[in-house]
């Protein structure tokens, strides 16, 4: 009987801690949406670089010149890379 009670109380404590941690993560993710930290900005920069270079490689077939992809938010495609203008 004592073992069952201890197991139930332990599970309840773990569940409470897990719920609290999940709420904290959700709050942090909402804060990140408002102001992006440097690591998230770096990921966005890498995405822009990848999108631009892939776009240029796909468009550059035969002797056709690569049409520069218009990168948004102050970025420009140069030499198959998005660079900050």
Curated annotation (Swiss-Prot):
It is found in: Secreted. Residues 1-22 form the signal peptide. SUPFAM superfamilies: omega toxin-like. PROSITE patterns: HWTX_2 (PS60022). The keyword rRNA-binding does not apply. GO terms for cellular component: extracellular region; host cell postsynaptic membrane. It comes from the Eukaryota. GO terms for molecular function: toxin activity. This is U4-theraphotoxin-Hhn1w.
């Amino acid at each position: 009987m004592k073992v069952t009670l201890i197991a139930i109380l332990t599970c309840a404590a773990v569940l409470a801690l897990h719920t609290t941690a999940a709420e904290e993560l959700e709050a942090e993710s909402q804060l990140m949406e408002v102001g992006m930290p440097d690591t998230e900005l770096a990921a966005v920069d890498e995405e822009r670089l990848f999108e631009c270079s892939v776009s240029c490689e796909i468009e550059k077939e035969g002797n056709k010149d690569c049409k520069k992809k218009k990168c948004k938010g102050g970025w420009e495609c140069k030499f198959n890379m998005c660079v900050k203008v």
